[in-house]
Amino acid sequence: MLFERNNPYTTDSLLAKADIQELITFERFSRDNSLWDSMRTCFADDAHINISWFSGSGEEFVESSKAMNRYAPHQIYNSQIWINNGRAIAIMQATIQTRLSINDVQMQLNSDAKIIYCLTKIENTWYIHHMECVYEKDSLTPVFPSSMTLEQQDFKSYRSSYACLSYCLNYLGYEVNYDLQGIDRPDALNTFYQHLDHWLTYRSDSLK
């Protein structure tokens, strides 16, 4: 079912798709604009989040994002949604953007990723049950023309799909999970997508 073309939409499935699209866009909007109480309403009570700098519950994710206190807006492109009764998977293509000072030079980090949302319908309302990223590529460049040079050796220990993101998070004092999903590990990624499909089609209840 996952990655297959959706059947023609009925009125009910079209409304469900609109609700899910609104939910995932609003979750990122809330995160980008520090609307923590609003962000909290997007997650199911048993939600689990697994991204570069955080792994834990939805509630903990909101509190950790608040404590991080860093502006990192998301440029959202397109999203694809698959719905199966009370479960759904949405894949959002986005670029995570942030600026930070490295060696007194203002730098721009852009990280391209697919944000994977697994959603459940609870009492006629959709909630995020699980959120994870598939990392693709990133870049780190000076904001203004500069002779700033970072040694390639500094990036060799990082995964190519999120090397610059990992470098910046480490620079800011955050630990990074180096075993996340990324296009540089296609076999593991295919297994991950199969696992998602099993969950979506009710062949499995686990997403961890």
Features from the language model and the residues they span:
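A hydrophobic membrane-anchoring alpha-helix module
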Residues: 150-208
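Short, surface-exposed coil-to-beta transition loops
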Residues: 74-76, 109-115
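Short beta-strand edge/turn micro-motifs at domain boundaries
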Residues: 89, 114-163, 173
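Short, low-complexity N-terminal intrinsically disordered segments enriched in polar/charged residues
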Residues: 1-29, 33, 41
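Short, cysteine-centered beta-strand-loop-beta hairpins and adjacent loop/turn segments enriched
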Residues: 97-109, 137-141
